[in-house]
């Protein structure tokens, strides 16, 4: 698919971001994801326990956060070159990331995201979906392993 089509179907600016979901996850899936991003990407993680920024996510702190019902604030930014993927550690039942579509300027940017999504899908052995913000039912892309499906409007 060409960049112009991708821009108009996925990365258009409507005032909202795009969400990335891996649904029906558990703590093991999250640990797999944390190990993947810690090994492959530049990270900026806010450790809510120490109130410090760190370059690696400490999964034991995330598990503690979940046990304390979210009393610690914790987010992470994963950098795919110039693209920032934000991660929210709400609970272990789904992995949720979000992206700002305005950061996507080229087919290369799209391909960087696709590479990340494929790695996540393969590592967790689960489907990854990209949706409109807060709309998991409105799927823009599905990734299963190396298979990428763009849902045309």
Which residues fall in each region the model found?
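Short secondary-structure boundary micro-motifs
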Residues: 4-7, 60-62, 70-72, 112-115, ...
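Residues that cap or initiate secondary-structure elements
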Residues: 26-28, 82-84, 93, 103-105, ...
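Long, contiguous N-terminal structural blocks used for assembly/anchoring
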Residues: 1-65
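Short, hydrophobic/proline-enriched secondary-structure or compact coil segments at domain edges
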Residues: 15-24, 93-103
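Acidic, proline/glycine-rich low-complexity IDRs
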Residues: 1, 102, 107-153
């Amino acid at each position: 698919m060409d960049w112009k089509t991708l821009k108009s179907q996925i990365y258009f600016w409507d005032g909202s971001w795009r969400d990335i979901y891996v649904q029906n996850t558990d703590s093991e899936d999250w640990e797999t994801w944390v190990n993947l991003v810690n090994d492959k990407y530049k990270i900026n993680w806010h450790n809510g326990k120490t109130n410090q920024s760190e370059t690696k996510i400490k999964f034991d702190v995330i598990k503690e956060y979940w046990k304390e019902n979210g009393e610690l604030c914790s987010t992470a930014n994963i950098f795919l070159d110039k693209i920032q993927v934000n991660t929210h550690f709400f609970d272990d039942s789904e992995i949720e990331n979000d992206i700002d579509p305005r950061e996507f300027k080229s087919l290369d940017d799209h391909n960087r995201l696709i590479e990340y999504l494929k790695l996540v899908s393969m590592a967790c052995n689960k489907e990854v979906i990209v949706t409109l913000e807060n709309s998991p039912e409105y799927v823009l892309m599905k990734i299963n392993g190396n298979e990428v499906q763009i849902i045309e409007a």
